[in-house]
């Protein structure tokens, strides 16, 4: 179950700060409890710590690259991770805004840039102001957040994975599902068939890797995207930069070729393809 709205989030950084402050016999500590969105003052005690009128135990066991949330039902901090058919995990970054992993595969860039700032640059490519936008694979919502900040008229965002939606409910960097952002739990390959022709001004397509969701790279899906997109509308398709020598595939060029066959002009930009409907 999702945590309460005022649940603190901890990483190894904050936990180590708490232990160091306790060892130094400090009374208070300034630290972040929301993945660097803000700073809070907590009270440091010998056996627990206090924040917002509540007391919490010190997590005695913790790992790097893990976000911990307070689970009231367990009376303990638990990893922000779920396992169903795959392991889905929220992963902290040095930038504050987290990425996430599915079975150990990182879903958002974070090695050289904040995944939140990376989303800003990609959303700028489709020029969101006053547009109706389809966000095919909502993920943690960073594309949607920047569309809203960029003045989009309406953002229709799809996310099929309930585990990802649960992570999104925990993540303070994820936007609220409130107008002009509409978040729908549905398979976008099915949903797109029901959308009206020429009903969107721009599209953001950030699918999982080809090996996980090949249907989101298919010519038939791209043709549906072309159908619902108005003429001269923009589509940004994230492909990543897979090593074609080790993977045996040149995914960006394969994507660009299929998009052209679907009726787009294409240009490779960074780790994706910017396409314009002819």
Question: Where are each of the predicted segments found?
Answer:
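Class I S-adenosyl-L-methionine
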Residues: 241-278
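Conserved SAM-binding loop of SAM-dependent methyltransferases across substrates and taxa
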Residues: 140-152
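A short glycine-rich, Lys/Arg-flanked "PGG" loop and its adjoining helix->strand segment in the class I
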Residues: 217-231
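Conserved beta-strand signature within the Rossmann-like core of class I S-adenosyl-L-methionine
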Residues: 232-240
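S-adenosyl-L-methionine
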Residues: 158-197
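Conserved alpha-helix/loop element of class I SAM-dependent methyltransferases that forms part
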Residues: 113-130
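Conserved class I S-adenosyl-L-methionine
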Residues: 129-140
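N-terminal auxiliary segments of SAM/dcSAM-dependent transferases
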Residues: 1-93
